Amino acid sequence: MNNDAISTTVTSIRNANTKRKAMTRIPVTKMTRGIVQILLEEGFLKSVTEHTEGGKIFMDVKLRYFGKEKKPYVATIRYISKPGLRIYCDHIRIPKILGGMGIAILSTSYGLITDREARRRKTGGEILCHIW
């Protein structure tokens, strides 16, 4: 497993979507729990269940697809702020993803929130990832 929990989460979801898997397993941290919760609230995921296996907590994330071709709701998920290069912005410079069709997840003093919520609260933070 990678030492960076955010990249592990983003990569697991991206790989599962590419292979049209129904579910993926992600190790639980406060950060991964927050990211998955936002994706669930925004409708990109179907459901999430937590379970313990060998003393470690994991989340089983059920991915959401539509149509007969099983097209994923998460077309693209991109990791932005990396451990070697952190990306911060204030509320004025928060990017609109696909003109508001996608979301950006930010780590702020309010916790993990979407770009819309950050603009509404007029707060900036670290841009973790873009999803559309």
From Swiss-Prot:
The keyword Zinc does not apply. InterPro entries: Ribosomal_uS8 (IPR000630), Ribosomal_uS8_CS (IPR047863), Ribosomal_uS8_sf (IPR035987). Signal peptide: none annotated. GO terms for biological process: translation. Its main location: plastid. It comes from the Eukaryota. Pfam families: Ribosomal_S8 (PF00410). Gene3D superfamilies: 3.30.1370.30, 3.30.1490.10. Belongs to the universal ribosomal protein uS8 family. Part of the 30S ribosomal subunit. This is Small ribosomal subunit protein uS8c. It comes from Adiantum capillus-veneris.
